[in-house]
């Protein structure tokens, strides 16, 4: 991702701007102090000015001497600033491991046994963690661990005395998340596109708790017991965390009062997600796929199964055709794997994934999607499953599985599978089938077929074939249908001595047709004059090779005779016998001929030549034995007269069947001093090395990953999942971060203890780094005369939130919905208060209560920041809610003017928050 490459520079420039801003305020404060003006009555100079006397940190000692000269002070500021950025980078990398362990933990499944009403039992797997619960607990902890641990470490490390750094970082981080991250996500969506929150009820619950958390923080600071945090206040703050999680879970599961509300969702039990079922949007504000004040007036709607099957079929054909066009040499299994990679790269992902992806691509660790391509290809192959209620206990359901089939025109025949499910499988069952025309016609495109499938006792599925007719005419893809009918069960003869009454009381085995009972077969046409291409775009040869052979491939059809001109073009390697012999001419491909070879002599002059290159290029191919009708349709003279509709269609199809150049019309030949046949092995190794999974299996894998440079780049740059070379930026960032990557490779792999070992060790390391960051930030602030509250709000909050910013931006661009990009912002803000401040203050309040004293917390600056943030958060959430109206379409994106206005508003709110919080800290405006 190109924007990720600017992350360190962007972070540095923004930090520099913030430093300049705060130093400007310091100059104003110093000028006011020199003139004898008192900024605010009733407040002493010590509380209104930043102290230049640094205090001992939790880990870092004081840098002596304490009163350095101006030059030494500038040097110290630079050292502290660079160290802060480097420590933030280290926290991002260990947070990558931490989030990977959370992904492993939250994706765990367990087996459950389900007992059906008829007494049968079946075993299935379900996710242990609910998505909403994991987002508000482990996911929030993973993204906010530095802020939470900083608050706890600051209190415990300074003798259980309240500090400004931890709480101010939490409030400042909340402001940055709410205003800057959401503002960026609004802006980066392409003009005219929108993203909306899907689970709006959960978002409302977390947003309400987010605002309540900061209102509650103000109440315990300035209302209940001003300046003192009592034990019950700290414990109640901490107790609000599980209450928030519980209510969000209730909203997600639609329990309590939610179950009485109108449901317009279909729940996918297998994936645990909610899918909207209605697309009509009347005027108003949309909420969870339902318009407010709207009602379901009638029951006439298109069945979901039909829509999904049709859309899935079209999407599958489009992906396979595109991939086959780009990679005609690939076999079907490779195309399926590439298609699965494409689907994986475009599906909705968790916030943890984007956080890990952003960090790894920023640090030269590569694209983790390329690791999952093979595994996802297997997992996604069994996604078509019909969920219908059992008609009766003793009825067998008969249907196609799958219901969509694709085949090439020259395949000969296509196999279709009929499945029976449930009922008594000890009986023989019969079901008739018959082909029906679609855009494909029986006798011309396929063989008309009808017959009866016999499922013998114990058989649950049976295959039958339909012949496909191959012709020499290039035509568009066509489809036909196969319909099941007249399902029946072979009944046994009446047993001797059995009374009719007894026979009638027995539940006779019966069978019914279930959906889908109609299969769609799509014929992918392969009649084409051919696509002509080299095997690759670059080849390395040794100068001692003598005569090199270059293959020209003819793929995706081999109809007719085609001539392909070619020539060599000089680069740094010169022709005419200096480095190679010039070559030019024409290749003539006969009918059904698929490969031709170009021979070029390479001159061996015994010189050390590295990266000398030249190019072999093909020109436009032309048909030789074109039919008269096709030649007339494609001739220039035909444009002088108006064609009939039939001639226009025939001309269009003829144009599509013309020979064309493929993916590699040019071949760059690089002449080196030596050449070894290892390109295939290298590609295989690179593919293996690119398999960067979120989880790790061994320490060896982690250390290999830590010292390996892999290419970043956008997922859309290479839909096949194949490797490109690392850029200069990838190498630079790798060498800058290799210390952290090797150090954190010592963390236990995520496979150990189901991720919990990695979880515990990672959070301990994050805590240690956070303690160092707190000391660096405090020493940085005191060196330039900043208060801890200002340093926390401006610098620490910014540094801890930068990785989340880039992760949210990636999620906003790549996800269909806005949940992964901004849906978790409000939840994280609430968790920061309940865990970060609640835990730290509970520990401190209990400690001082055991000493018979009270835990004192200064309410001034923190209470003012909390109040200011709460007001601005109301404005932000109101704007987001208004943006769900139909003329805007969603929280993110929209028309360019609306995007700019929203982004500028949110950024302005953050700048105003920073300005007012800083002015209040230095007593330029009166706080509480």
UniProtKB/Swiss-Prot annotation:
Binding-site list for Ca(2+) 2: 409, 470-471, 526-527
Tissue specificity comment: Detected in gray and white matter in the spinal cord. Detected in hippocampus neurons. Detected in brain cortex neurons. Detected in skeletal muscle (at protein level). Isoform 1 and isoform 2 are highly expressed in brain; levels are higher for isoform 2. Isoform 1 and isoform 2 are detected in soleus muscle; levels are higher for isoform 1. Detected in gastrocnemius muscle.
Induction info: Down-regulated by hypoxia combined with glucose deprivation (at protein level).
Protein's membrane topology: Multi-pass membrane protein
Disulfide feature: none
Extracellular face of the membrane: 31-73, 169, 223-230, 749-755, 801-829, 883-904
GO molecular function: calcium:monoatomic cation antiporter activity; calcium:monoatomic cation antiporter activity involved in regulation of postsynaptic cytosolic calcium ion concentration; calcium:sodium antiporter activity; calmodulin binding; metal ion binding
Cytoplasmic face residues: 95-147, 191-201, 252-727, 777-779, 851-861, 926-928
Cellular component aspect of the GO annotation: anchoring junction; axon terminus; centrosome; cytosol; dendritic spine; endoplasmic reticulum membrane; microtubule; mitochondrial outer membrane
Pfam families, A to Z: Calx-beta, Na_Ca_ex, Na_Ca_ex_C
UniProt similarity note: Belongs to the Ca(2+):cation antiporter (CaCA) (TC 2.A.19) family. SLC8 subfamily.
Domain remark text: The cytoplasmic Calx-beta domains bind the regulatory Ca(2+). The first Calx-beta domain can bind up to four Ca(2+) ions. The second domain can bind another two Ca(2+) ions that are essential for calcium-regulated ion exchange.
Name the UniProt record assigns to this protein: Sodium/calcium exchanger 3
Species of provenance: Mus musculus
